[in-house]
C-alpha cells in the first residue's frame, strides 16, 4: 500500500513537472522515484539494479 502511495505521488509530480517545465529527464524521474520509495542501487551499478538492490545487467533501470 505504501508503495502505491509513493508511486501515485511520483506520477503526479512527474505530470506536474512535465506541464510546467517541458519534457522531463527520465533519469531524473527515476532517481526521484527511487529516493521516494527508498530503493537504492549499489554504487557499481546505479541504474541497473533489480528489486533486491543487486546489480542486474538485463534490468531496464
From Swiss-Prot:
Q: Does the keyword Ligase apply?
A: no
Q: Which UniProt keywords apply?
A: Amidation, Disulfide bond, Hydroxylation, Ion channel impairing toxin, Neurotoxin, Secreted, Signal, Toxin
Task: Write down the superkingdom of origin.
Answer: Eukaryota
Entry GO MF terms: ion channel regulator activity; toxin activity
* Propiece residues: 22-38
Signal sequence span per UniProt?
1-21
Q: Which tissues carry this protein?
A: Expressed by the venom duct.
Q: Which residues carry this modification: Proline amide?
A: 60
Which residues in this protein are found as 4-hydroxyproline?
57
Localisation? Secreted
Q: Does the keyword DNA repair apply?
A: no
GO cellular component term, pick one: extracellular region
Provide the record's note on post-translational modification: Contains 2 disulfide bonds.
Quote the function comment for this protein.
Probable neurotoxin with unknown target. Possibly targets ion channels.
Q: What is known of its domains?
A: The cysteine framework is XIV (C-C-C-C).
In Swiss-Prot or TrEMBL terms, this protein is called Conotoxin Cal14.6
State the organism named in the record: Californiconus californicus (California cone)
